[in-house]
Amino acid sequence: MKIKLNEITIREVFNGYVNNDEEGGVRAYDGKLNIRPPYQREFVYKPEQRNKVIDTVQKGFPLNVMYWCKNEDDSFEVLDGQQRLISIGEYLRRAYAIDYRFFDNLTKDEANAFLDYKLMIYICEGNDKEKLEWFKTINIAGEKLFDQELRNAMYTGTWLSDAKFHFSKTNCGAYILAKEELSCDGPLRAPYTCY
């Protein structure tokens, strides 16, 4: 697998950011970056984690590196960093405020400093088997993946995507019927759910 480190600004990455599960998922980087490819789990960061990402960027502190896979058509998929990227993207589109300030309430200098922050991104090129092995390796740290989430990474496809769409939301029928039995953070993190 070929791996190269790149510095890409938030401004560049989030040009064309869209978060719409029904219409192509979560995309950025002029539509070339699939932030939530089929093997990725749903967004699971709690508000405190999400806010820490924004706080880190605003203070100019280093944010953990991210990994993207380059596809044959020169598009990219997020291998690691989805939670951080969605945290940033949702902040930029006014989904939440930090200290009662939305992104568009920042001063021009604050907004430019935020947008000019450089993300450290390793771009990886390799075959599907190499990408999966790399995905398993880099996901040892951070928000631990359940075994089922690793299985979901191996067996992607339309069936799994459709099942996740219908059964991995806190307002879905499966969650409403069985929420007392879930011993975790809900259907998004159910360790034994075969979504």
Predicted regions: what they are:
Residues 68, 93, 100-103, 110-195:
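Solvent-exposed functional surfaces
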Residues 82-98:
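Short active-site loop/helix that positions an aromatic residue
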Residues 78-80:
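Short hydrophobic beta-strand that contains or immediately precedes a catalytic carboxylate
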Residues 1-76, 93-95, 119, 165:
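N-terminal leader or domain-start segments enriched in small/polar residues
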Residues 47-51, 82, 128:
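Conserved structured core elements
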Residues 32-34, 38, 42-44, 62, ...:
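Residue-level preference for alpha-helix termini and adjacent loops
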Residues 75-76, 85-87, 110, 130-131:
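Short catalytic/ligand-binding loop motif for oxyanion handling, primarily in non-cytosolic enzymes
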